[in-house]
Amino acid sequence: MLYTYAGPEISVATTKAYSTQLIGTYMLAICLGKARGLIDEREEQRLLAEIAALPEKVQRIIDDKERLQWFAAKFSNAKDVFFIGRGIDYAICMEGSLKMKEISYIHSEAYAAGELKHGTISLIEDGTLVIGVLTQSELYEKTLSNLVEVK
């Protein structure tokens, strides 16, 4: 059993539990990679530094209230929200879509960017908010190309 020490969850969207599970899994992956000789000391330190930088990055997003309020006002009438991503970003899209439904009660779906041409693109109407998740540099251009298609 891997304890995350998240403490009691008080949010319907379980953001704290989800976030700590991700960090716990990431830490476990680092330890396993090191134990198997797939990650050296330098790479381990780089990955741990990324984790240590997360609180500051999250705080910058929280502090950007003006921009967040602008986005919320601009898209507050959206009836549908689609999250689009490839690879591991698709998993992030599924969680983002779930959070959107749980918190805002707006219809939301997650789609693999490569599957848009197979009928999904026809569901995107005027006023649909499409959120692209692009965290993998090797898939950036392909995903961006898919997002341009839905514009």
Predicted ranges, named:
Residues 1-151:
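A SIS-like phosphosugar-recognition module
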